[in-house]
């Protein structure tokens, strides 16, 4: 009986040990799920050390050259530009398939649209500024990497972090007492917006939904004179909300920038 019991016990121990061994396929699948990198394509446009185009389809204008964007920008294929709703979103991009690639990720912000050519040939494509494309290279090999022209890359959506920079609202030059349009820039976190609302001052003031005009510009055609100061409520693409109270003052002027005291 004792020997039979020992045999059964030994068999149980062996089975238990085998069961507890890691399964290669399960382990690989687990790590694949943890990875947030996806495959895409990249080209570059504009000057070799420039910011792509002057402003781009999001409407940021000269801000693309200046800090905090600092020329590290991208024009996105339709799948990530999202008819302008992707403006301001941040991505890490890296390349490994060229000898000049460093393999280290760099962060870019979406400021423009790439509507045709290679941007339609694959699900996700980044047409990077020359500066951003070269930033993926090994030290001293930026020109060599740019000479490749087209790359397969890996990309990852990441939160935007503009340090101490606050939300900025640039009043569109076409605005008037009855029509108000504003460019929103430097949103931390999601970076892109799904909704913008305005509250004017006065009796019965309430939040009024603005409409996306184009790119990162939102508009409200009130049909009657709006009473400033205005508060603006932003909803990010993931549903987070933030209020910039009285950020647009009385006596606002078209073309002027107004900096809030808040950010996501």
UniProtKB/Swiss-Prot annotation:
It is a peripheral membrane protein. GO terms for biological process: plant-type cell wall loosening; sexual reproduction. SUPFAM superfamilies: Barwin-like endoglucanases, PHL pollen allergen. Residues 55-165 form the Expansin-like EG45 domain. Pfam families: DPBB_1, Expansin_C. Keywords: Cell wall, Cell wall biogenesis/degradation, Disulfide bond, Membrane, Secreted, Signal. Transmembrane segments: none annotated. CDD domains: DPBB_EXPB_N. The keyword Cell wall biogenesis/degradation applies. Residues 178-260 form the Expansin-like CBD domain. PROSITE patterns: EXPANSIN_CBD, EXPANSIN_EG45. InterPro entries: Expan_Lol_pI (IPR007118), Expansin/allergen_DPBB_dom (IPR007112), Expansin_CBD (IPR007117), Expansin_CBD_sf (IPR036749), LolPI (IPR005795), RlpA-like_DPBB (IPR009009), RlpA-like_sf (IPR036908). Gene3D superfamilies: Expansin, cellulose-binding-like domain, RlpA-like domain. The keyword Repressor does not apply. Disulfide bonds join 58-87, 90-160, 95-101. It is found in: Secreted, Cell wall; Membrane. One of its GO terms (cellular component) is membrane. Residues 1-27 form the signal peptide. Belongs to the expansin family. Expansin B subfamily. May cause loosening and extension of plant cell walls by disrupting non-covalent bonding between cellulose microfibrils and matrix glucans. No enzymatic activity has been found. May be required for rapid internodal elongation in deepwater rice during submergence. This is Expansin-B15.
